[in-house]
Amino acid sequence: MIVSRCRDIEEFKKVHAQCENDRIPSAESILALGDYCFCFYSKDTGKLLGCIYLEDDNGRVCLSGFSVRKNYDIVIRAIKLISDIFHEDDLYSLTDKKSAIMVLLRCGFKKIDDETYLRKAF
């Protein structure tokens, strides 16, 4: 897995459009986050597998993202990498998606209410 900035906006928009989650902002809004938008690519093919981004949510650092289907292990590795980079911040994530919840729990996030998960700073 390779993590970097967006390499191809059209590819980014295509993967973003395949996402079935109304909570995800527009592709343009995510790309506008600049240094807080991390794309992850296949080491073998160079294709975009997904994106993790950080936003401010009323003073909380909120981690969100999207990916192509059936790449749980890669998504977990990507989230752990980004979480380690921002280890001095409490990271929150808001979701009701079972697949996202499974990934967050495997990355050390804890459920703190119905749809909110937290990974404490370390």
Task: Walk through the language-model features, giving the residues of each.
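Short amphipathic alpha-helix that is part of the acyltransferase structural core
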Residues: M1-P25
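A short helix-loop-beta-strand connector motif used in the catalytic cores of GNAT acetyltransferases and
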Residues: E28-L48
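Conserved beta-strand in the GNAT
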Residues: C39, G46-E55, R60-S64
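Conserved acetyl-CoA-binding loop-helix of GNAT-fold acetyltransferases
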Residues: V68-I85
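Conserved GNAT acetyl-CoA-binding A-motif
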Residues: I85-D96
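Conserved active-site alpha-helix within GNAT-family acetyltransferase domains
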Residues: D96-D114
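STAS-like cytosolic regulatory interaction modules
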Residues: D114-F122
